[in-house]
């Protein structure tokens, strides 16, 4: 997709905020515990390569991604740190992963058998590093029984093309005040890992929520994701142990303003009709940029004042009700601070009845990312 550099709409990423969030968590970790920064989905919409660089400077010793292509992007950008692909990859890509020193998540022994066959043919110079995923209650991927786990571990021990580098699970409710299900998963994890005769290099269960609120579970590595971007994993349910600094802002400018009179309508479907004479401004951003159509009725900030989005959000533009006329080029803040007022991703997510993760990841590549500080 084309990046809209000739349009006054941009995501602004605060590198210092990223650094402060990540460094704050690094300093909380017990001695010997490493932080891998999760930069999947283009760094939660913030830019994977740029976030990885800041994370490295802040003390991260490795990275986690969702798919192999994201790992290859980091390697192409010059990162030599360990990279773990959290999703299941194709066995035929095992030689490429071994060659690029990218670690694979494995959720079934038949994957190991298939990957071993490809590795035996390709004969890479190093074995494929493997992290065994355990399904302790997420219901997504992973080994569920002790028998399944020990079978996989035995296979790894007898095949030189594969190296047992790590083992992990993922908690479904670590961001909830109710710890009942979380404790059930912890117990299942402990039961499964008790079957191991030897621990691998990395043992990790902690996502952002677990590391923030259940640090005793951290073991020797945490997968630090959404909190590194300054977003509370629980939304507003649980206070963070330190101040998280949101790193993402979204700004634009007015490209047009006009006066409408009572009875005139605005936008597709004529869903908004003026009840009196008022000023309407047009902002060049829409749902093609990831600004949700369901944000009709929400607000943006103009000159520090909240201005309602009127009519439906269009593909490329939206309209707002202004208190008075403003000049073309006047700044519009869609996420972030303007004067004494601030719009947060959490506030937007609440309005859309979703989570801030979804909104952050949904901003498309048509929006340029500008990095500051």
Curated annotation (Swiss-Prot):
The keyword Isomerase applies. It is an enzyme of class 5 (isomerase). It catalyses: L-alanine = D-alanine. Pathway: Amino-acid biosynthesis; D-alanine biosynthesis; D-alanine from L-alanine: step 1/1. The modification N6-(pyridoxal phosphate)lysine is found at residue 40. Substrate binds at residues 140, 315. This is Alanine racemase.
